[in-house]
Amino acid sequence: MLSVTINDGVVKASSLKRKDNSSSDKSNYKLVRKGDIAYNSMRMWQGASGTSPYSGIVSPAYTIITPINNIVVDFFAYQFKMKSSLYKFQKYSQGLTSDTWNLKFPLLREIKMIAPNKNEQIKIVCLLKKLDSTIASNQRHPFLLKIRPRPPP
């Protein structure tokens, strides 16, 4: 059983410190394959999406996107987290209030996303992953960052 979170994307539901409220009948649950993008249609505008590092199942409330040729799935996973994309997702979501906003796939498909060629997508993803790794490392070891006062003129 997998879950989609805002901060961590697709994770094993067992890794979350939540009560399992899933149905005992999983026949309507959706299959996710490693490399698919899964998103929570009611929270896409908040960034509840991610590339799945696992194969498994998710709640029927989630939407699964299977990548096609010439698409680097992680490129779009990063793009889906950008503020400009979140704004578009909010704009295209349907519902009266933020509690009921919903972005189903037919509407998501209408949103224009710009993507360079596949090689550029790969380069961009590599750079962003290195930045993520550096940021995570610095957050784990804040003592490595020292603020030095500016020398007097």
Which ranges hold each PLM region?
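Feature detects amphipathic, helix-rich regulatory segments
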Residues: 1-153
